[in-house]
């Protein structure tokens, strides 16, 4: 009995479930038909609108008809395909246009395009603007459209489905992250995985973490070095400016009626900078020691030059450059003086006698010295046969003279030409970066101060003997040994450095001179007087050589 009741209940309960499923399926079917109806209606409206636009266009511009264009017959269908292909691919892509019109070749299509362009050009040049506006379309009237391929449409549909389903790649990859570990982190900075970022950056940029030429860090000694330069140069500038300001009032101070104090003006500071040559650059030193600063090897005819030989060659080129530019400037000054003299003489003659004959003018012109171009041509013709180097030098002088004529006769123009000459001297050689420093380069780069201290003691011992005098006389290096500067007694001495440490005993004069001359490397400016009292180990402390054009710092 109970089983029959349960069966009845199950049969009764099955009826409403089947009814709900039927109702749900009918609603889904209704929604599907409704969406389909809306799609068909929208498509019909679009087609109707396009047909209306096409009918209006035909009413306005007419229907294409067949005609002969440049000896070739074009039917209405071919013209329609032609304009569709031009709108899709452009008028320059003849191959794609010819692919769309199988009955026409690329040459025939090109002739049709040229005929249309010529007609358009004639219409723009010979038809009034009011009439032309009725015959031609404007760019703003042309609808903006872009034609997409079926592959692009399929890809867009696929991306849209992924966005709706929530199955994008980033969601799949990040779904396994532990949310509890993220909550336990203290700050937002902990969310960055620095190790993974480092790996990604190394894979992306493909270069080593360490630079090939790492620069030395700026130490406290370098900062003090720069501050000392600024202080010393500023002191010189202020002192010279005060001297110039006082010189302007020197005569007025002699009279008791005037009791004014000198005032430093702007022109005093500018003139002081020119007196101290702050506005000039050491151009020869810059280009001469460029390979040394950049740690380059110098090669000439596939042979590496030593530093001393390279400096000697550059100094000889420097002397020739100074001589050449000096002659050019002297010649230019003389030409300017001759021109000014001739102009003033001609002006005074015109004022005294307004009517000069052609013969007198010709005689005055002939009396002027010959043009420098003829002199240069004569020098060039004479020296080319006998002295080729001199011919090249005179040719360089003419080029430098033309540069001086084009630019203003100023210090900046002279420095620019001089810098170009020295730069050309440097690039005559082949320069390569040094991969591995040799023993000689290593000694030249860093030098123990203990060697300098031994040398200073040796020099102090020999100062009163004949050995030191012989050493100073027979020294043929770049500079002499100066104990003090001529301008300031506080400037520290510039000392020679030699490869081998100088012995403490005093040998013969000839042995000292030969030993020191053979071991000469460069110049070093350092305060050696305070070195014995210093707490630092002189064996560990190293010094670098300074160039001949670098200045020493005043002691504190």
Swiss-Prot record:
Q: Which InterPro entries match?
A: Homeodomain-like_sf, Rrn5, SANT/Myb
Mind telling me which SMART domains this protein's record contains? Answer: SANT
GO cellular component terms, A-Z: nucleolus; nucleus; RNA polymerase I upstream activating factor complex
The terms under GO molecular function for this entry are: rDNA binding
One GO BP annotation is: nucleolar large rRNA transcription by RNA polymerase I
Q: Name one Pfam family in it.
A: Myb_DNA-binding
Instruction: Name the keywords, alphabetized.
Output: Nucleus, Transcription, Transcription regulation
Keyword Transcription regulation present in the record's keywords: the answer is: yes
Q: Where in the cell is it found?
A: Nucleus, Nucleolus
Entry superkingdom? Eukaryota
What is the purpose of this protein? Component of the UAF (upstream activation factor) complex which interacts with the upstream element of the RNA polymerase I promoter and forms a stable preinitiation complex. UAF seems to stimulate basal transcription to a fully activated level.
UniProt subunit comment: Component of the UAF (upstream activation factor) complex which consists of spp27/uaf30, rrn5, rrn10, and histones H3 and H4. Interacts with rrn10.
The record's PANTHER family line, in alphabetical order, gives: RNA POLYMERASE I-SPECIFIC TRANSCRIPTION INITIATION FACTOR RRN5
Q: What is this protein called?
A: RNA polymerase I-specific transcription initiation factor rrn5
Q: Which species is this UniProt entry from?
A: Schizosaccharomyces pombe (strain 972 / ATCC 24843) (Fission yeast)
The gene from which this protein is expressed is: rrn5
